[in-house]
Amino acid sequence: MRSRSSIAVWRSPTRPSRNAVLALAFAALAFAGAAHAQDAASAPKRPVHTFSIVARDPATGELGVAVQSHWFSVGPIVPWVEAGVGAVATQSFVDPSYGKLGLDLMRAGKSAPEALKALIAGDAASDVRQVAMIDTQGRVAAHTGAKDIQAAGHKVGTNYSVQANLMLNDTVWPAMSRAFEAAKGDLADRMLAALDAAQAAGGDIRGRQSAALILVSGKPTGKPWIDRIFDLRVDDNPEPLKELRRLVVLQRAYNHMNAGDLAVERKDNQGALREYSAAAALAPGSTEMVYWHAVALVNMGRVDESLPLFRQVFKADKNWLTLTPRLVTAGQLPKDQKVIDRILKAAN
């Protein structure tokens, strides 16, 4: 099986008092307002006109942002999400500092409405911003500036906000709201449904180019690389939502692979096989997944079951055949030459 590296994380030996936390929150609020005002005054106005959704799943606590725009590489600019803290979408003539500072304030104890109010108050150009925030308790706030290019608006609902600007018409964000509330599935499915509804209602008057989706766990570990369930970007594509959906399915498959690896580590062989099978069903063309499934079977002592999978992979690409003996030295396959020979003969 694939090994997992661990990184030691420094942790404070003492827990700060409630008063200390509150003091930090107020200090962060003052600092954020000053920093934001300075940033807003000097930063260029990036015209990331777009539609987006910020949302929380009340059942799981998951938080997410999904967005599409006719602007190159919208992913690094608009969506900001942190497990255990909140989610922010900052767009229109965008000031990215709303994302970082909004999360800073919510982390320090401010609600989403309090954080957004403070940042707007410190922004001399708030009339061209469009921002939405949600915190871990589902408290939501949104702002559409008076000078955002029309059609522009937002709608706040229970555990979500949808917002859009530079749209073909003013039916876009109401359509997003209806779609999100009616959609089935998990939070990613529902956010994608909202984006699809926006596009179907007319979408960005200029067209479409990029999209992104970030979704984090409702059970934060303090390790962002674990907490992020989806962190996907489509930077430049004529059909960004179709490509984003494809990536979501592929990410689900890899999530199953990771869950299978963890099951192997727990000696839960049946659980591992269920996860690997689920991954294969979602990504039937992936030789990578088939290969590591086969490796896991060998490490379970189920060599006979692994051979057809190895044969399938070796037929697709001989480089996997070259790789296989190297896994022995790396500790990913047993130091049993008879077993390795059987695997390699599967290529014949």
Predicted regions and their residues:
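Alpha/propeptide regions of enzymes that mature by internal proteolysis
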Residues: Q38-R206, L213, D235-R266, A281
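Residue-level recognition of tetratricopeptide repeat
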Residues: D261-L262, V295, T329
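Canonical tetratricopeptide repeat
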Residues: N258, W292, R326-L327
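Short coil turns that delineate tetratricopeptide repeat
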Residues: P284, K318-N319
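Canonical positions in the second alpha-helix
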Residues: A279, Q312-V313
